A protein has these predicted regions:
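Residue-level signal for nonpolar/aromatic packing positions in well-ordered secondary structure
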Residues: 42, 66-70, 118
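Extracellular/periplasmic periplasmic-binding protein-like sensory domains
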Residues: 1-65, 76, 132-167
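Segments of small-molecule ligand-sensing domains
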Residues: 49-60, 71-140
Length: 169
């Protein structure tokens, strides 16, 4: 997330090549159709409303995908936009974004299944970004990456936690 990495990168102290993790928004990947334009429009929001550039962040991706989910759910229940109707619609809607097809919320835990980019943080060699970008090791879809219901139940049981299946509600 740029809010955590920008100051380290600007000071020349970012540990490039030593940070590995999951990135939700591969903002640096211009080869994804529409990504460069989306990132540019996101940055323009900062210029328009805050008089400064807004660098890509996980929060930006979260806003995008959350609003997209709400809009797609509303299309399926346009006659009733009550909280109950929207909650039900969100639990069954499937949609696509720039970063993947068939995004949805799992019924048993309401976690969104979407693409996860496993990356090593590297310095941008193009000169476009002042913040770390990712060297993509693998891209996983939600169902490949997230624990199954059975795995979550087993983990909860082993650790004396209560697992609540939200699909049963």
């Amino acid at each position: 997330d740029s809010t955590n990495t920008q100051s380290l990168a600007e000071a020349g102290n970012y540990p490039y090549g030593k940070v590995h993790g999951v990135d939700l928004w591969p903002f640096w990947m211009d080869e994804i159709d529409g990504n460069a334009e989306f990132v540019q429009r996101y940055s323009e929001i900062g210029k328009e409303y805050f008089d400064k550039d807004i660098l890509p962040s996980d929060m930006g991706y979260t806003w995008y995908v959350g609003i997209k989910a709400i809009c797609e759910a509303a299309k399926t229940t346009a006659d009733d936009l009550s909280p109950e109707a929207m909650t039900n619609a969100l639990s069954t809607v499937h949609f696509s974004t720039l970063y993947g097809d068939d995004l949805y919320f799992r019924d048993f835990d309401h976690t969104m299944a979407h693409a996860y980019y496993y990356v090593t943080a590297v310095e941008d060699t193009t000169g476009k970004w002042s913040i770390p970008v990712g060297d993509v090791y693998a891209v996983y879809e939600g169902d490949e990456m997230l624990p199954t219901k059975e795995e979550m139940e087993e983990y909860a049981s082993k650790n004396n936690y209560t697992f609540t299946d939200l699909s049963a509600k």
